[in-house]
Amino acid sequence: MAAASVTSPGSLELLQPGFSKTLLGTRLEAKYLCSACKNILRRPFQAQCGHRYCSFCLTSILSSGPQNCAACVYEGLYEEGISILESSSAFPDNAARREVESLPAVCPNDGCTWKGTLKEYESCHEGLCPFLLTECPACKGLVRLSEKEHHTEQECPKRSLSCQHCRAPCSHVDLEVHYEVCPKFPLTCDGCGKKKIPRETFQDHVRACSKCRVLCRFHTVGCSEMVETENLQDHELQRLREHLALLLSSFLEAQASPGTLNQVGPELLQRCQILEQKIATFENIVCVLNREVERVAVTAEACSRQHRLDQDKIEALSNKVQQLERSIGLKDLAMADLEQKVSELEVSTYDGVFIWKISDFTRKRQEAVAGRTPAIFSPAFYTSRYGYKMCLRVYLNGDGTGRGTHLSLFFVVMKGPNDALLQWPFNQKVTLMLLDHNNREHVIDAFRPDVTSSSFQRPVSDMNIASGCPLFCPVSKMEAKNSYVRDDAIFIKAIVDLTGL
């Protein structure tokens, strides 16, 4: 893997775990998955044990201090002192990030046809897809982002409204229930047909309306007819004999039990007086409450308007925060790229000779055998300050015909800032060496580029296809003679012939 400076995971923290697996439009490879959340890596960090984690996941794990790597434990690869997750030894895996961000992606939201790369999805589409399902804060239902405003204003059953009659605040779902008790709700008189009579004055209208049907005054003694107010006198004249008969019958019944009447009469009179006093008191209270209800309704309407304004402000601020978070995330990525470039510049050479030290050889070899990190790229080096840009690629467990038996070493022509000034195809002799620490038996291989190969044409992407030696050095030779591996490190040297440049 390309060398990188060790940076705290917190510096790239975007408070988001890995990408959903449903984003990939191609078959998913295990190397792209976070060892913690098992989703696609987002801002990958590599621990010293070789496992990769999302920046968010690693920060969450390390929030309570250094931890054992659960992936090492699960895979049976735990090593004391190596399988430890800690901020000081984890570093941003920019090579893995570039691979992940270049993967083809499709939007997982139903109905959306967007396609692109993971990098484009994160920067331009994630969180902005019109088909994204979001939760309505009022009714808790799921609505598409593009329909959220219409839902909030027109369809949400919990949307805040004001009664059109009394202006009291009310949700849409409770509006019909409110109409049943609203003091300003318009009623229609069945007698005269007058409409839009407020409920609070309807009884006064009924008492005054000549067309309203009321009980006959003699209903207490047995007359059950309902008569219009204006015809009440005619009814009493027409039913005079019947009313007198009812009165006589009632009188005779009362006369038959005078003791009971004498006992009940004063008690009923007293109760009536008490009830009349209470009614008068309650009427005064109702008047006060009506005025208070009107005042509260006006206040509630003002609060409702202010609430809507506040909600609009909150939504606008929330959008700004999201934009700022996205902007900070992009700046963090740019900063990581700059850190990577500075780190590479510190070890770059400009004379065509490059010595690459690979530390932690034992661990990196185990990772290559396990398939977690099969290849490692060196920092870039140059033939001159304005010359060709190159790097090395090594497979510690071999590649192709050398897999499992040899160390494979390749030479890579990279896209440089001055390619337009250089001669193409690249045609300089390349010598590759595995250095013997005793300076006696260096493993050496050299080749002159095949100018017809695409590996040595002017690069159109970050780097050309690697070319070199899949059978560079047998693993058995390295293990049998400890002069190649010393202090758990090996040194690889590349020499580019500058003749003709």
UniProtKB/Swiss-Prot annotation:
User: Entry's InterPro entries?
Assistant: MATH/TRAF_dom, TNF_rcpt-assoc_TRAF_met, TRAF-like, TRAF1-6_MATH_dom, TRAF2_MATH, TRAF2_RING-HC, TRAF2_Znf, TRAF_BIRC3-bd
Q: Where in the cell is it found?
A: Cytoplasm
> Where is this protein chiefly located?
cytoplasm
Effect upon mutating E283A: Reduces interaction with BIRC2
Which Pfam family would be a valid example here?
A: TRAF-mep_MATH
Zn-finger (TRAF-type) intervals are 124-180, 177-233
Q: What happens when the gene is disrupted?
A: Important embryonic and perinatal mortality. Life-born mutants appear normal at birth, but are smaller than their littermates after three days, fail to thrive, and few survive more than three weeks. Thymus and spleen are severely atrophic, and mice display lymphopenia of both T and B lymphocytes, with normal erythrocyte counts. Their thymocytes are abnormally sensitive to TNF-induced cell death and exhibit high levels of spontaneous apoptosis. Macrophages are highly sensitive to TNF and produce high levels of nitric oxide (NO) in response to TNF.
Residues modified to Phosphothreonine:
T7, T22, T117
Residues the record lists as Phosphoserine modifications:
S5, S11
Q: What is the effect of changing C34S?
A: Loss of autoubiquitination
User: In this chain, where does the modification N-acetylalanine occur?
Assistant: A2
The ranges of region (Important for interaction with BIRC2 and BIRC3) come to 283-293
Q: Which GO terms describe its biological process?
A: apoptotic process; CD27 signaling pathway; CD40 signaling pathway; cellular response to nitric oxide; innate immune response; interleukin-17-mediated signaling pathway; mRNA stabilization; negative regulation of apoptotic process
UniProt zinc finger (RING-type) residues: 34-73
Q: Which regions form coiled coils?
A: 298-348
Keywords from UniProt, A to Z, are: Acetylation, Apoptosis, Coiled coil, Cytoplasm, Isopeptide bond, Lipid-binding, Metal-binding, Phosphoprotein, Repeat, Transferase, Ubl conjugation, Ubl conjugation pathway, Zinc, Zinc-finger
Q: What function does this protein fulfil?
A: E3 ubiquitin-protein ligase that regulates activation of NF-kappa-B and JNK and plays a central role in the regulation of cell survival and apoptosis. Catalyzes 'Lys-63'-linked ubiquitination of target proteins, such as BIRC3, IKBKE, MLST8, RIPK1 and TICAM1. Is an essential constituent of several E3 ubiquitin-protein ligase complexes, where it promotes the ubiquitination of target proteins by bringing them into contact with other E3 ubiquitin ligases.
Subunit details = Homotrimer. Heterotrimer with TRAF1. Heterotrimer with TRAF3 (via TRAF domain). The domain containing the RING-type and the first TRAF-type zinc finger can also form homodimers (in vitro). Interacts with TNFRSF1B/TNFR2. Interacts with TNFRSF5/CD40. Interacts with TNFRSF4, TNFRSF7/CD27, TNFRSF8/CD30, TNFRSF9/CD137, TNFRSF11A/RANK, TNFRSF13B/TACI, TNFRSF14, TNFRSF16/NGFR, TNFRSF17/BCMA, TNFRSF18/AITR, TNFRSF19/TROY, TNFRSF19L/RELT and EDAR. Stimulation of TNF-alpha receptor TNFRSF1A leads to the formation of two distinct signaling complexes.
Protein family (similarity comment): Belongs to the TNF receptor-associated factor family. A subfamily.
The free-text domain remark for this protein reads: The coiled coil domain mediates homo- and hetero-oligomerization.
Protein name as annotated:
TNF receptor-associated factor 2
* Annotated organism of origin: Mus musculus (Mouse)
